[in-house]
From Swiss-Prot:
GO terms for biological process: translation. NCBIfam families: rplO_bact. This is Large ribosomal subunit protein uL15. Binds to the 23S rRNA. It comes from Thermotoga petrophila (strain ATCC BAA-488 / DSM 13995 / JCM 10881 / RKU-1). Part of the 50S ribosomal subunit. Keywords: Ribonucleoprotein, Ribosomal protein, RNA-binding, rRNA-binding. PANTHER family: 50S RIBOSOMAL PROTEIN L15 (PTHR12934), LARGE RIBOSOMAL SUBUNIT PROTEIN UL15M (PTHR12934:SF11). Residues 1-45 are annotated as: Disordered. The gene is rplO. GO terms for cellular component: cytosolic large ribosomal subunit. Belongs to the universal ribosomal protein uL15 family. The keyword Ribonucleoprotein applies.
Length: 147
């Protein structure tokens, strides 16, 4: 085999289609776009959400509900997490929860929920508590303080 014997794989050297270059080219006049209509135009894209002119689904369905601007979104922490991550008589604060990667950010505050058991006395400082969480913290000899 010599260098001049090398040939590209059949089908690898496809000619590009030159459109709009006269009737003899096979792609003249309308350039393969057919006659008139939106898709024959220069910027003739039909957007993916277009439904052919009928009223789109999102406008046919009624509006429902609203977003409450006063809603508080709390970062929630369960009592069982405090049991695992804190020693007895330790103070639990939002800063310590972020530092120990129990929560990512404060949001509108921290709410302690009562899932799991608590055996160690802890001083827990948070923005909100569930009733069951307060009961479990106080029955373990700890204190629940709202900040």
């Amino acid at each position: 085999m010599r260098l001049e014997d090398l040939r590209p794989t059949p089908g690898a050297m496809k000619k590009r289609k030159r459109v709009g270059r006269g009737p003899g080219s096979g792609h003249g006049k309308t350039s393969g776009r057919g006659h008139k209509g939106q898709k024959a135009r220069g910027s003739g894209k039909v957007h993916i959400w277009f439904e052919g002119g009928q009223t789109p689904l999102h406008r046919r369905l009624p509006k429902r509900g609203f977003n409450n601007i006063n809603k508080k979104v709390y970062a929630v922490v369960n009592v069982k997490v405090l049991e695992e991550r804190f020693e007895a008589n330790e103070e639990v604060t939002p800063e310590k929860l972020i530092e120990r990667k129990i929560i990512k950010d404060l949001k509108d505050g921290i709410k302690i929920l009562g899932d799991g058991e608590l055996t160690k006395p802890l001083v827990v400082k948070a923005h909100a508590f569930s009733k069951s969480a307060v009961e479990k913290i106080e029955s373990a000899g700890g204190k629940a303080e709202v900040i």
